[in-house]
Amino acid sequence: MDPLKAQQLAAELEVEMMADMYNRMTGACHKKCVPPHYKEAELSKGESVCLDRCVSKYLDIHERMGKKLTELSLQDEELMKKMQQGVTST
């Protein structure tokens, strides 16, 4: 595959993943913090605080999971290299 096309595909996938994360986060936080039948157009103080905390926690967990998955992926790559070296040296 052409490196430019690969880079473009990776960028498109990243945008799609970020949009998916945003949609899931807003849906989950809205469901948790805003009652299904509301009478006011503006958020109440409690709803606003709840949404702020929910989004903050969601992003924090997303970042932690990303770091952990990257760490595990690197460990897997190192293990595969060691296994391949063991196979080629025998």
UniProtKB/Swiss-Prot annotation:
GO biological process: protein insertion into mitochondrial inner membrane
Gene3D superfamilies found in the cross-reference section: Mitochondrial import inner membrane translocase subunit tim13 like domains
InterPro entries per record: Tim10-like, Tim10-like_dom_sf
Subcellular location: Mitochondrion inner membrane
Any one Pfam family match given in the protein's UniProt record, by short name: zf-Tim10_DDP
Record's bilayer topology term: Peripheral membrane protein
Keyword Membrane attached: yes
UniProt free text on domains: The twin CX3C motif contains 4 conserved Cys residues that form 2 disulfide bonds in the mitochondrial intermembrane space. However, during the transit of TIMM10 from cytoplasm into mitochondrion, the Cys residues probably coordinate zinc, thereby preventing folding and allowing its transfer across mitochondrial outer membrane.
GO cellular component term of the entry, any: mitochondrial inner membrane
Motif Twin CX3C motif in this chain: 29-54
Top-rank taxon: Eukaryota
Transferase recorded as keyword: no
Originating species: Xenopus laevis (African clawed frog)
Annotated PANTHER family: MITOCHONDRIAL IMPORT INNER MEMBRANE TRANSLOCASE SUBUNIT TIM10
Disulfide bond entries: 29-54, 33-50
Family (UniProt): Belongs to the small Tim family.
Subunit structure and binding partners: Heterohexamer; composed of 3 copies of TIMM9 and 3 copies of TIMM10/TIM10A, named soluble 70 kDa complex. The complex forms a 6-bladed alpha-propeller structure and associates with the TIMM22 component of the TIM22 complex. Interacts with multi-pass transmembrane proteins in transit.
The protein, known as: Mitochondrial import inner membrane translocase subunit Tim10-B
Assigned keywords, A-Z: Chaperone, Disulfide bond, Membrane, Metal-binding, Mitochondrion, Mitochondrion inner membrane, Protein transport, Translocation, Transport, Zinc
Function: Mitochondrial intermembrane chaperone that participates in the import and insertion of multi-pass transmembrane proteins into the mitochondrial inner membrane. May also be required for the transfer of beta-barrel precursors from the TOM complex to the sorting and assembly machinery (SAM complex) of the outer membrane. Acts as a chaperone-like protein that protects the hydrophobic precursors from aggregation and guide them through the mitochondrial intermembrane space.
One GO MF term: metal ion binding
Transmembrane feature ranges: none
